[in-house]
Amino acid sequence: MKIHDCCSTADGLVVGVQRHEAVSQHCAQRAVEAVSGVLGRYRFGGSLRLRLQRIMFADDGIVAQLNYRSPRVTVRIQVPIVAEDGIEAIADRLDCHIRRQLTGRPLRSWPDPQRPVVGFVSECRPITRRKRFHLMVLEPHIAAAVMDTFDFDAHLFIDAETGQDAVVYWAGPLGVRLARQSKMAPLSTAGMMTVNPIPTLCLSEQAAIQRVCMYGLPFLFFTDVRDGRGRLLYRRYAGDLGLVQGRATAPGR
């Protein structure tokens, strides 16, 4: 069961909170106070949506997802915490993201100690969230910046250099890696990231699910056998799976 709360602060910040019934109101209030304290220092006003839900595969685990929008910055963060002891981690991550946007600092470092990989072996789990978007046509380094801004583990987009679906994701040795469907052209922005040299697997949706769950993968970028488009299948904190796919036909096909 989901519980919705809404409030506003003295500096004009409008706050909406959605929490799972297993997450106490006291925990939600502490989280609101922590992030409001950060935003109060910047005096941006704006609107904040905070969602708190239990992590089904971790005792006392909570995942906090925060979306903040103001005339100055737009921030999305997602961070797992252990019970109420990790509330400050939400505020710290928000502060870091805002400062990086305001100062133009480089992408966050990887590995990220606040965001352990959500990957574990399990029986085949269902896809409980499907996201269909008109994918943005981006240069790979811009896609990496979008991934960082919205605190994604991986980001699906149309690669401006090849015209194909592609993903960027956090991985060594440079922190960001690019995976393309089949065209393994060298990057025009050399040194920004590494490129996965292996063409993307062509799979059915069910085969992709089996691969993620059998091998404990946090996500899988694959080409769907039905239409030849790229898909991003990922493990959710709730334990089930999510799928991201594009709506429009990619250019250059």
Predicted features and spans:
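N-terminal, polar/charged subdomain of small-to-medium soluble alpha/beta proteins
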Residues: 1-253
